[in-house]
Amino acid sequence: MIANILTIAGSDSGGGAGIQADLKAISATGGYGLSVITALTAQNTVGVDAIYPVAIDFLKAQLESVSRDIRIDAIKVGMLGTPDVTVAVADFLSGFDGPIVVDPVMVAKSGDRLLHADAVAALRDALLPCATLVTPNLPEAADLLGTSEASSKESMTEHAKQVVALG
């Protein structure tokens, strides 16, 4: 049986991240990709030119539509953007019983901020407790923990333990 994997993330017009990259990865590993878009971005390999978050009602409509009709075996969460989107996704995830991978996307590789600073608390407090696996990079882990970035193997290990304790 093919696994149905739902990705909840932003759309990257450059195709190198977000929904587009997730769907490619899901397909390449033999899964069937489903998607719910949290934001539209105008970006390329150089940077992010604009971000347009989807309306909460439309986000909820996407979640309801896909989950009503298709079995979801696992969920991957990426860019959420705003506190409202983060809380709405967390509410949806609280009713899901399968594996949930959360990539707490906060900053693009170009350095552009993708998660509002006021959404970090919602991500940490509402979303991470739903996660089976969280995949922060060093700056994201520091942001989630409200501390400086880990710079040694020991501090990285400590940050990892603290992130695990969040959920």
Question: Each predicted region: which residue ranges?
Answer:
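Short, glycine-rich nucleotide/cofactor-binding loops
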Residues: 9-15
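Loop/helix-junction capping segments adjacent to catalytic residues or to phosphate/diphosphate-binding pockets
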Residues: 16, 83, 153
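Active-site glycine-centered loops adjacent to acidic/histidine catalytic or metal-binding residues
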Residues: 10, 103, 137
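Conserved phosphate/ATP/ADP-binding segment of small-molecule kinases
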Residues: 117-167
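Conserved N-terminal subdomain of the carbohydrate kinase-like
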Residues: 2-7, 23-109, 114
